Amino acid sequence: MELDPSDSNSRVVDASQFSKYRDAGALVSKAFHQVASRCVPGASTREISSYGDNLLHEYKSSIYKSQRFEKGIAEPTSICVNNCAYNYAPGPESVIAGNDNSYHLQVGDVTKISMGLHFDGYTALISHTIVVTPPPQPGMGPYIGPGADAICAAHYASKAVANLLATNNSDDPITGSRLRKIVDDIASQFRVSVCPGSRIRRISRFLVGQPTIDRLEEDQNTKHAVEWPAPEEETRKADVTNSLDPANVLSTELNTWHVMPKEAWLIDISMSSQPISSLKEHPDLKPTLYIHDVNVSYMLKLKASRSLLSEIKKEKSVFPFHFGSLSSERNLLGLRELTDRHILVPMPVLISSPSNVIAREELTVITQPNPSSDLLCLTVPTPPSYVKSDFSLEDGTDAALICEGINVNIKSININV
């Protein structure tokens, strides 16, 4: 594994890289559709998450058998329901005295499925929101309410961003401020809020926005991203700049770069039915997902810690992993020392208030070499559940024109791999 964010050539997707992106997208999409079919009333989120990871392991082992590069899960399967935003992936720890204490899906649950796969560091991530419904019955209506507003907003926002990326050309460059504005406008029209953690960012080999290595790009000034932190974090950044107009500072920062042909981009938009001051760590659920911070080193005291770190370096790379996927229970004894020394960073289960509903859409795309109104979507776009919002895109607005008025051919990969 080599991380070199300063290498500008690594940003242009060549034929070899394209094949790895394509295969990662095809296989993670195939796994996703099988996982989604299991999201039915009464289903165990632990069993669904485990099933998704098993599929990813099976699929990644089915190709590139003679190649000696890294391949594996880039994001463990998580099943986040209603007000849960990120990182709920219950494992063996949720089984107590033979009872599965993980959350079991119920009718009406707004359920976000997230997973990812990589080959040689070329990554495809996907998230999609579905509504858990009972078996179809005559006269069954759509899902309605604030959750439906959030689902519609996330759907149209991800579509609008994809359309903008597809129409990029040198005469009308797509900048970060344009991408941010269209997402914020759609949230406003559906009377919802963009959830902290949402992002639109350029990705490259091994670099998909992991917090532990994100600063490598920041240090090299090669990070091209639109991010939605919590409101208080945006205020803090504005205070640091001592600006009288924080919006102008943000706009200036986002206009220093623009989208280029043959780049890989991650679109990850979450919408909240209510404004969120911040996401909070779940008070009772311990993290099951961890990520190795390659920037931190320490002379470990415990043999179990050294053994565990060796396994992680060999098998997990720089991507998040589920602690249940570690091979040896003995090695798990070293988990505490690795986290205490910040070599492993836990990814807590993040939630908002119980009355809130969050919807998420995430897809990975590659811009085409010419401004041909084509975009290659590595993860197969999935239509939203049967929902109905009281709101819609307002006629004549940029959001409506971009979503519905631009003739964009979003090409999908073939998932029959």
Swiss-Prot record:
Recorded superkingdom: Eukaryota
Keywords assigned by UniProt, alphabetized: Cytoplasm, Hydrolase, Metal-binding, Metalloprotease, Nucleus, Protease
Alphabetized InterPro entries for the sequence: Creatinase/aminopeptidase-like, PA2G4/ARX1, Pept_M24, WH-like_DNA-bd_sf, WH_DNA-bd_sf
Gene Ontology biological process: proteolysis; ribosomal large subunit biogenesis
EC number: 3.-.-.-
Keyword check for Lyase: no
Major location (coarse): cytoplasm
Subcellular location as annotated: Cytoplasm; Nucleus
Role description: Probable metalloprotease involved in proper assembly of pre-ribosomal particles during the biogenesis of the 60S ribosomal subunit. Accompanies the pre-60S particles to the cytoplasm.
Family statement: Belongs to the peptidase M24 family.
Name of the featured protein: Probable metalloprotease arx1
Organism: Schizosaccharomyces pombe (strain 972 / ATCC 24843) (Fission yeast)
Lineage summary: Eukaryota, Fungi, Dikarya, Ascomycota, Taphrinomycotina
